[in-house]
Amino acid sequence: MKRRYFILPALLLMLFSACGDDENNYQIGGKKGEDTPVQPDDRQSEGPEIAKYNLEFPALKGGKSVVVVHYGVYNDRLNKSGYNYAVEWDSEIRAQRWSCYQMYEDNYKSGAQVTRYNAKNDGSLSPECQYPNDPDLPESYRLTADPYKGSGFDHGHICPSADRQRAVEANYQTFYITNMQPQNNKFNAGIWQDMENQVRKWANNFDTLYVCKGGTIDKSDWILRYLGSGNNKIPVPKYFFMAVLGKKGSNFKATGFWIAQDSYTATTLQSYAVTIQALQKNTGIDFFCNLPDDIENEVENIPLSQMEKEWTWFK
C-alpha cells in the first residue's frame, strides 16, 4: 500500500539542508506555498531516495537495472545547482530504458541560454569527446567503445540538450552515452524533434512539467536490430515513447506519445498521442506512480478524445 505525503516548502528546506545528495532536491512544481501531493510507491524502495518522491519517476524495473541520478549546476546566471535528470540503465541489455526530468522556471525558462556542447566525435567515450561515458554509472556496466560510430544511426538524446541550455554543466550531462538511444536520422531530426518542440511549448504553460521518455528494449519484437558486439552490443528500439505530466497550481493533466521509428507515416503529432493508460500497456512501464491514487487514476484514464482537447497542439 502506498503512503501519502505532502511536500511543503518548509520541508523542502529541511530536506535540502539535512539530507544526502539523493535526498536534496525535490523540485516540486506549483505556485509558491502550495502543497504538492506525493504518494511513494513501494516499488521505489530499492532505488535512490529521490525516486520515491519526484513525480517524473516511473516504477523502477529492479533486477539488473540501476537508476543513475545526475546533479550539477542547472542555471549559470542564477548560480543554482541540484538535480538535473535521471536514467534507468539495464546492465544486462546494456541500454537505457528511460530518462526522466522536470521542466520549470529556473532550469528551463529563465537565465541566459548556453551554447550546446560540441566536441570531437571520436567514439572514445572519454570525458572530452562528444558522447562521453557516464561517470556516475558503475564502471563494470559501462560501454568501452561507442557502438553508434559508423552504424548510420544518430545518437538520439532522450533528455534533450535543448531542454538543458541554462547551464554548461547541465547541458554537458545530456550528452552522456547513457542518455542516448539509436535513432535513424530522418526520425531523430524529424518527428521526434517535433515532439520535443511540442513538449517545450507545453512547458511554458505549466508551473512544472514532469517528463519520462525512452525506447523499447525489453522484448525481441520491440527491437529492430543491434549495433556493436560483445559488451558493446546495444539494441535499436523499434518504438519510442514520451509520458508527460503537467502541473499548474493544484491541477494535473497528462498525455503521451507512442511511435515506431521505422514505419510512421502521419506527420501530425496528434496521430501518435495516447493516454498514459494506453502507454503503460504498450511499454509495460507504470508512469507517475508517485502520484496519489486518485490523481493518478484521473490523469491516466481520461478518454483519448478528452485528453486531446485538454492539450494545445502546435503541429
Regions found by a protein language model. Give the residues of each.
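Sec-dependent N-terminal signal peptides
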Residues: 6-11
